[in-house]
Amino acid sequence: MRTLHEMGAGRLYLHLDGWAQPGYDNGHPDYLPACREAGGWKGMKSLVDACHEQGDLFGTHDQYRDYYFAARTFDPRNAIRLADGTMPEHAMWAGGRQTYLCAELAPDYVRRNFSEIATHGIALDCAYLDVFTCNEGDECSHPEHRMTRRECYERRAECFEYLLAHGILTSSEEVSDWAVPSLVFCHYAPYDFQMRSPDAPRHGIPVPLYNLVYHDCVIQPWMMDRVAGGDDYMLYALLNGGAPYLIRDAAYAGMDGDMNAALRARTENDIERCAVVAGLHRRVGMQELVRHDLVGGDPLVQRSVFADGTAVTCDFHAQTYEVAANGSH
């Protein structure tokens, strides 16, 4: 983080996965304590304090839906029950065998865990509650905690509201209309084609439908990849008036600021690109996206217009962009 600041990155938000003893996607909802091998609570506080000294924000990854059999307090009575009385389970993620925690109980675990984090002097700025906004609402038929899908969404929102009440900015995987009142930002909200192979056919013309409704309500970070022989994803970040990802994938090459010349040059270029997107986001982040056009009917030339008059035009033929503020370039 210090190296990135030295390179001119400006204010950053550090999202940390796998920070607790069980490891990433393991042991939820009994995720604490902080990983001993990484310095434990003392080391975690030191990291958070170092971020704050530089004016940066710090947030954690957490999870209150996947319910791992290896969790310290695992009790099958707390799990979702399907209409036929069975308990769903799979072993897809790193933590192995799991079911789903009934959301009626999730707020209790959130209160317990975040209260414990605070007792160690760790002042979280943000928290990412994984999967809540990318999975449909669960139904539960357990007689002790029956739940409809609407009630599931209400309990998930209660988790977000608890964090907000304690000064912690809320985040989850994607964006959903039910979560808008209690969600500050998300992991991402990519177009469908951005989740597929670059050579895969696209299922239509990508347009910012969600942002035409909710742009001023939820901050959306955008991928900044430049696809060889394809699109520069930075253009979609600009069209949507979003925030940029500087580093999205964990990597060991730059650990402890030890960057070789090639990596440093690439990072410097990434910082310059992110500065453009971040600058626009500072201007329009709280503005409504009021219009989006295919310029001249050409789907590869798109323009977004924000409530303050800022217009962003992206030409995907040439992979270029133009930002005009109230008619001036």
What are these language model-derived features?
Residues 1-112, 120-127, 131-145:
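Aromatic-lined carbohydrate-binding/catalytic grooves of carbohydrate-active enzymes
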Residues 71, 79-94, 101-127, 131-329:
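Active-site-proximal substrate-binding groove within the catalytic cores of carbohydrate-active enzymes
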